Protein backbone atom coordinates (compact mmCIF):
# COMPACT_ATOMS: atom_id res chain seq x y z
CA UNK A 1 0.00 0.00 0.00
CA UNK A 2 1.52 3.30 -1.09
CA UNK A 3 0.63 6.21 1.18
CA UNK A 4 1.60 9.74 0.16
CA UNK A 5 0.78 13.25 1.32
CA UNK A 6 0.62 14.55 -2.25
CA UNK A 7 -2.35 14.41 -4.62
CA UNK A 8 -0.45 12.25 -7.11
CA UNK A 9 2.28 9.62 -7.17
CA UNK A 10 5.14 10.19 -9.61
CA UNK A 11 5.29 7.44 -12.20
CA UNK A 12 1.70 6.31 -11.60
CA UNK A 13 -1.71 7.19 -13.00
CA UNK A 14 -4.88 7.12 -10.92
CA UNK A 15 -7.06 4.44 -12.49
CA UNK A 16 -9.99 4.78 -10.05
CA UNK A 17 -10.89 6.84 -6.98
CA UNK A 18 -12.26 4.58 -4.26
CA UNK A 19 -13.18 7.32 -1.79
CA UNK A 20 -12.38 8.69 1.64
CA UNK A 21 -10.61 6.38 4.07
CA UNK A 22 -9.66 6.78 7.70
CA UNK A 23 -8.24 5.00 10.67
CA UNK A 24 -8.23 6.17 14.25
CA UNK A 25 -7.30 5.23 17.78
CA UNK A 26 -7.72 6.80 21.19
CA UNK A 27 -4.81 6.40 23.59
CA UNK A 28 -4.86 7.10 27.30
CA UNK A 29 -2.04 7.94 29.64
CA UNK A 30 -0.61 5.26 31.92
CA UNK A 31 -0.24 6.14 35.62
CA UNK A 32 3.51 5.44 35.43
CA UNK A 33 3.79 7.81 32.47
CA UNK A 34 1.83 10.45 34.37
CA UNK A 35 4.30 10.31 37.26
CA UNK A 36 7.25 10.54 34.86
CA UNK A 37 5.55 13.39 33.01
CA UNK A 38 5.06 15.28 36.25
CA UNK A 39 8.73 14.94 37.13
CA UNK A 40 9.83 15.91 33.61
CA UNK A 41 7.54 18.93 33.87
CA UNK A 42 9.60 20.11 36.82
CA UNK A 43 13.03 19.63 35.25
CA UNK A 44 12.27 19.80 31.53
CA UNK A 45 13.08 17.38 28.75
CA UNK A 46 11.35 14.90 26.50
CA UNK A 47 8.69 12.68 28.03
CA UNK A 48 9.85 9.52 26.26
CA UNK A 49 6.92 7.38 27.43
CA UNK A 50 4.44 9.79 25.84
CA UNK A 51 6.50 10.11 22.66
CA UNK A 52 6.55 6.33 22.29
CA UNK A 53 2.81 6.09 23.03
CA UNK A 54 1.98 8.69 20.38
CA UNK A 55 4.28 7.05 17.82
CA UNK A 56 2.55 3.69 18.33
CA UNK A 57 -0.86 5.40 18.11
CA UNK A 58 0.08 7.02 14.79
CA UNK A 59 1.26 3.67 13.40
CA UNK A 60 -1.99 2.00 14.48
CA UNK A 61 -4.16 4.75 12.94
CA UNK A 62 -2.22 4.53 9.65
CA UNK A 63 -2.52 0.73 9.65
CA UNK A 64 -6.29 0.96 10.17
CA UNK A 65 -6.57 3.51 7.36
CA UNK A 66 -4.62 1.19 5.04
CA UNK A 67 -6.97 -1.68 5.95
CA UNK A 68 -9.95 0.54 5.09
CA UNK A 69 -8.35 1.38 1.72
CA UNK A 70 -7.62 -2.30 0.97
CA UNK A 71 -11.23 -3.20 1.80
CA UNK A 72 -12.31 -0.71 -0.88
CA UNK A 73 -10.02 -2.26 -3.48
CA UNK A 74 -7.37 0.47 -3.40
CA UNK A 75 -3.63 0.00 -3.70
CA UNK A 76 -2.68 3.54 -2.63
CA UNK A 77 -3.79 6.47 -0.49
CA UNK A 78 -3.18 10.02 -1.69
CA UNK A 79 -3.67 13.27 0.22
CA UNK A 80 -2.70 11.50 3.45
CA UNK A 81 -3.01 13.52 6.67
CA UNK A 82 -2.72 12.90 10.41
CA UNK A 83 -4.71 14.79 13.01
CA UNK A 84 -4.45 14.69 16.79
CA UNK A 85 -7.08 15.91 19.19
CA UNK A 86 -7.71 15.71 22.92
CA UNK A 87 -10.77 13.61 23.66
CA UNK A 88 -10.70 14.14 27.42
CA UNK A 89 -8.15 15.19 30.03
CA UNK A 90 -6.09 12.00 29.81
CA UNK A 91 -6.75 10.77 26.27
CA UNK A 92 -5.70 11.73 22.76
CA UNK A 93 -7.24 10.65 19.47
CA UNK A 94 -5.11 10.15 16.38
CA UNK A 95 -6.91 10.14 13.02
CA UNK A 96 -5.20 9.13 9.76
CA UNK A 97 -7.14 9.96 6.60
CA UNK A 98 -6.84 10.38 2.87
CA UNK A 99 -8.28 9.37 -0.49
CA UNK A 100 -8.10 5.71 -1.48
CA UNK A 101 -7.18 5.18 -5.12
CA UNK A 102 -6.25 2.41 -7.51
CA UNK A 103 -3.07 3.35 -9.35
CA UNK A 104 -1.12 1.80 -12.20
CA UNK A 105 2.38 2.49 -13.52
CA UNK A 106 2.58 4.94 -16.41
Swiss-Prot record:
Pfam families: YbjQ_1
Entry's family note: Belongs to the UPF0145 family.
Protein known as: UPF0145 protein BH0643
Amino acid sequence: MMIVTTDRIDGYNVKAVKGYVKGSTVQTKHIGRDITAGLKGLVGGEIKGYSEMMDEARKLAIHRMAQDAEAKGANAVIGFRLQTSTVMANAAEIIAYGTAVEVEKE
